[in-house]
Amino acid sequence: VGHIENNESNIFDFIFIGLGASNSLIVLSLIKNGLLKDKKVLFVESSSKSNNDKTYCFWSSQNDSIIDDLSTIISHQFDKIKINNSNVQSLEGLFYYYIRSIDLYNHTFNKLNEEKIVIERAEVTNIIEDQDFCFVLTSSQSFRTRFIFDSRPPRLYKITEKDIYINQSFFGLHIKCENAVFLKDAFEMMNFNVEQNGATQFFYIIPFSSQEALVELTRFGIEKIDFNYASELVKNYILNEFGNYTIIAEETGCIPMTTFENEPSANKRILNTGTAANLIKPSTGYGFKKMYSFAQKVSEQISKNKYDKFNKSNLINKKRFKFYDTLLLIILLKWPLKGKPDRK
């Protein structure tokens, strides 16, 4: 357990716990709006964030502010889609954007360096509350701060019997094929040309060029996908559909799909961010665009010096969409094979 120090150099206005997508988007918004000019800021992150460990995809129109803000790190965009072996269709004014996590991390690192914001490479062991401050403890030291952005995942053991919880787990290969086999401006999703294995499983293909793509097997189910099993399925699928190929990289992950809503922190100085702020859409696992909107809202409140309800900053979820999400999760939980459309 860390010990509390009263060292002046360890006192901060804001401490960010974690340097994932949500906290990156928040700090980028604060920097863009000049809200950290007179602030002392610290990031506490145990990972080096030097690997491309995730990909972020989102739907948007071209004139949305997210495109202006992140245009330098958007590596691919698509205006056409193919769903479950159907014909290629236009997205009609919408685009599907692709960002590599390493590009977001590096973009954030560059901005933090410009602002001389320090990153403490450590894991947070505890947060101790005081009347006027919070103390963030690591194994070796402590830092005092007025406000915390906490992106640590929620403790899902708080889920009640009323809540639904399934996993969206996936295994993907970034490949280069010998032949030109991919349409460059069309991505493919919900390709159910795969065994369902007691859940809902489908392929998802993001092309990077006519020869290069990410081919991913996604599973919606209580049990997470077995990566050895998935690897064999993906490799066989690629060989049968696209011919000979070489593997450039592997991508794995798991996203919670749940009706459980994490409560705001009881401490008015701590704002939950990311998954802990309920920013992942329960029925799809998409969250990046919502994290961006959340960052803009937080930035706006800080610009107005609204700190009285700092811990309760959130995006209002429409009840109608909450109902749809719940309905789809019930179907995926109770009747997983219904997740796959019937062939006509």
Set out the residue ranges of the language-model regions.
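Conserved acidic residues
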Residues: 12-13, 146, 270
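Short, well-ordered alpha-helices that flank and scaffold nucleotide-derived cofactor binding pockets
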Residues: 28, 32, 110, 207, ...
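A conserved beta-strand/loop capping segment in the N-terminal third of enzymes
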Residues: 61-122, 127-130
